[in-house]
């Protein structure tokens, strides 16, 4: 992550830049009971400093452009929904460590740079399939993330509270500061990251990765013998991204770059719109169309080629490399059938995109004992399908987007630890969707590294 200059960005916007999204359909927005309180919070956010800087955002866009041609690989990972309660230094450190470990393995497998993006420092809002939640005979507003309302199933907690956006802003800033400290202060030392991975492969459950780890060992010894300056490898660039869901918050964080006059959403380096909010004529696409950040769109199995054409027209009409990523979430059973016509249509269009696989959201199931979960092997199967499609068509598999944690939770079935349905109850902690735990995340990285080598 680069060091930004604070005075690059100003809160001022001209009348010509007034948000057009307010006149468009805005799905998945909370109904705040106190509009005056909402207006006060938005005004407060507009006066606050940016969380990220234009130079950092531009650097990320250039890296994502490299991934679109196979000259880099994007790794996006983090919580389904961040929690105010779990926004601790230890939890942040463990997530960063997990992503750094995955990146080291992927870098060796791909023989290209890995672009590290945390689904962190802002992932506090979540879309929901229903506006309400019913338990027994009680129905309350759905939990929409800590930046909107509380998770507790009480009438008071579930009332949307705009002051939570201020809390989200402050916690996002704290997270970014810690990420900068960890990744720029020696914590990301390649030798240290490699030693963590050796600890992983020493586990008999992951013995099949031992030969890969030995290759990495030889590469490290060669680098040392060749006089590589490991001190120069103690720092890495690490970026932050989240879903642009809560429109009042995102709009309040838009700033103008004094160098270029361009607008940036300074709540994150990269933002994406989800499957539920990706309408080309909707408010979420409109707000991202007006900023210069790299953006992503979640693409499910019902997406048509015409849908993608309209989204490219709205979000990247000029065809700028690195501007638009298409994050596919097809489901393992459908990706080999649904993805090829979309890839072919985009290639025929000619405007560059970066293809990123989300193997999580299309593979969610409910276990027999009532837990929302995913199967590890199904997640891997969707990743394999993603690579197979791109290899067959001669296009670049640009990256992976996974929900993960650095903790030893038990939320995803299977993997080397053989988590079964009975084991889900041991450490099931997610607020919304199930995440890969630390060991499962590394297992995914080793599997993808083998695919990248092949």
Protein language model features and the residues they cover:
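Active-site-facing alpha/beta catalytic cores
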Residues: 81-82, 86-331, 374, 399-401, ...
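Long, contiguous, compositionally biased segments that the model treats as domain-scale units
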Residues: 2-149
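Non-transmembrane, aqueous-exposed alpha-helical and coiled segments at domain scale
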Residues: 323-355, 361-410
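Polar/charged alpha-helical tracts
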Residues: 36-43, 47, 221, 348, ...
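Glycine-rich, charged/polar anion/phosphate-binding loops
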Residues: 59-61, 281-284, 311, 340-342
């Amino acid at each position: 992550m680069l060091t930004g200059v604070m005075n690059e960005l100003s809160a001022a916007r001209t009348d010509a830049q007034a948000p057009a999204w307010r006149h468009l359909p805005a799905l998945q927005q909370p109904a705040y009971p106190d509009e005056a309180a909402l207006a006060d919070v938005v005004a407060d956010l507009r006066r606050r400093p940016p969380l990220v800087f234009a130079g950092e955002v531009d650097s990320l866009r250039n890296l994502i452009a490299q991934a679109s041609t196979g000259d880099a690989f994007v790794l996006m990972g983090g919580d389904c929904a961040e929690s105010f309660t779990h926004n601790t230094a230890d939890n942040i450190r463990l997530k960063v460590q997990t992503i750094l470990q995955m990146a080291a393995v992927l870098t060796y497998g791909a023989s290209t740079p890995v672009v590290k993006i945390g689904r962190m420092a802002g992932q506090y809002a979540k879309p929901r399939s229903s506006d309400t939640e019913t338990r027994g005979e009680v129905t309350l507003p759905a939990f929409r993330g800590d930046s909107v309302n509380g998770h507790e199933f009480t009438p008071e907690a579930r009332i949307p509270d705009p002051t939570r956006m201020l809390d989200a802003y402050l916690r996002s800033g704290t997270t970014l500061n810690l990420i900068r400290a960890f990744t720029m202060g020696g914590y990301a030392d390649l030798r240290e990251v490699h030693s963590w991975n050796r600890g992983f492969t020493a586990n008999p459950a992951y013995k099949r990765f031992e030969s890969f780890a030995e290759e990495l060992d030889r590469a490290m010894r060669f680098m040392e013998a060749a006089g590589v300056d490991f001190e120069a490898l103690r720092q890495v660039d690490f970026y932050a991204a989240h879903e642009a869901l809560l429109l009042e918050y995102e709009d309040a964080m838009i700033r103008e770059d004094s160098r270029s006059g361009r607008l940036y959403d300074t709540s994150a380096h990269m933002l994406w719109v989800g499957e539920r909010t990706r309408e080309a004529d909707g408010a979420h696409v409109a707000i991202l169309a007006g900023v210069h950040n790299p953006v992503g769109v979640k693409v499910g199995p019902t997406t048509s080629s015409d849908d993608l054409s309209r989204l490219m027209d709205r979000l990247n009409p000029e065809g700028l490399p690195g501007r638009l990523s298409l994050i596919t979430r097809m489901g393992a059973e459908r990706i080999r059938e649904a993805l090829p016509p979309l890839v072919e249509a985009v290639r025929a269009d000619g405007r560059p995109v970066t293809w990123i696989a989300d193997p999580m959201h299309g593979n969610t199931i409910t276990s027999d004992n009532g837990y929302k979960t995913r199967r590890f092997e199904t997640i891997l199967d969707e990743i394999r399908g993603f690579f197979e499609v791109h290899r067959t068509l001669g296009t670049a598999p640009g990256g992976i987007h996974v929900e993960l944690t650095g903790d030893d939770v038990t939320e995803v079935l299977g993997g080397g630890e053989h988590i079964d349905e009975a084991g889900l109850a041991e450490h099931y902690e997610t607020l919304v969707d199930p995440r890969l735990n630390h060991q499962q995340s590394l297992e995914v990285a080793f599997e993808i590294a083998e695919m990248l080598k092949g």
